[in-house]
Design a protein with these regions (language model features):
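Non-catalytic positions within long, well-ordered alpha-helices that form the structural scaffold/packing
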Residues: 58-60, 142, 193-194
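Active-site beta->alpha loop and helix N-cap motifs at the rims of alpha/beta catalytic domains
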Residues: 7-21, 41-54, 68-162, 174-180
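Short acidic/polar active-site loop segments enriched in Thr and Asp
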Residues: 63-65, 147, 198
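Catalytic alpha/beta core domains of metabolic enzymes, predominantly
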Residues: 166-203
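Active-site catalytic pocket residues across diverse enzymes, especially alpha/beta-hydrolases
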Residues: 57, 164-167
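Secondary-structure boundary/capping micro-motif
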Residues: 32-34
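A short, Lys/Arg-enriched amphipathic alpha-helix followed by its capping loop at the start of a domain
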Residues: 52-64
Length: 203
């Protein structure tokens, strides 16, 4: 097999660039409302952080559209705290995206924290008990008023999207694949879109 055949396949049979597109044209896709760009703030880990962000944005007359929040996991918040967090978002027209569970360092095994091999093993869920607890926290967040989730596991994304299509999960719930899942090409983006991702943060 000649590499030239691979190149020709990508050029002629796919919509993917062969190399990096330094001449990238403007996208024809837009956010709701027609904007080509929006402001997303990350690192908001508590209700007090969110309140201060809202105050600062108001003071500077800046519209913040989306907030990447509680990356440490919503399991760290009790129900009252989670509902208050969601209410701040609703009152200020903010799209909140949360991580429903704590990181792999909190799971039932030590692999993730046991050196280089564990670190590169990824942030995916391990075992069906973890998947079960993950889904329970998704439900808890939805009940609290959260409508956006950071996803680090493609299998969980597939299941969640199937549930959204069936109407079990509200259709207005959004799934954004985190950079922690390790995707960084247009091919990855298409894969994640096919699995149900509404957006993703590349490496």
């Amino acid at each position: 097999m000649a590499f030239k055949e691979m190149e020709d396949y990508i050029k002629n049979k796919t919509n993917y660039p062969l190399r990096e597109r330094y001449d990238m044209p403007d996208s024809k896709l837009t956010f709701p409302g027609g904007a080509q760009a929006r402001i997303e703030i990350s690192g908001i880990e508590s209700a007090s952080n969110l309140e201060e962000m809202v105050k600062e944005a108001d003071k500077r007359n800046i519209t913040v559209h989306r907030v990447i929040s509680i990356v440490r996991g919503t399991t760290m918040l009790d129900d009252q705290e989670l509902k208050y967090f969601a209410q701040i978002g609703a009152d200020n027209d903010l799209e909140l995206l949360v991580n429903p569970v704590a990181s792999r360092a909190w799971d039932t095994g030590r692999q993730y924290t046991s050196g280089e091999e564990g670190i590169v093993s990824g942030m995916r869920l391990r075992g069906h008990d973890m998947l079960y607890r993950y889904l329970k926290n998704i439900d808890r967040c939805i009940e609290a008023g959260i409508r956006g989730f950071l996803i680090t596991d493609e299998a969980a994304l597939t299941l969640l999207n199937d549930m959204r299509e069936e109407g079990i999960i509200p259709e207005d719930v959004k799934f954004k694949v985190s950079f922690l899942a390790g995707h960084g090409t247009a091919v990855s983006g298409k894969l994640l879109e096919n699995l149900g991702a509404d957006s993703f943060n590349p490496l």
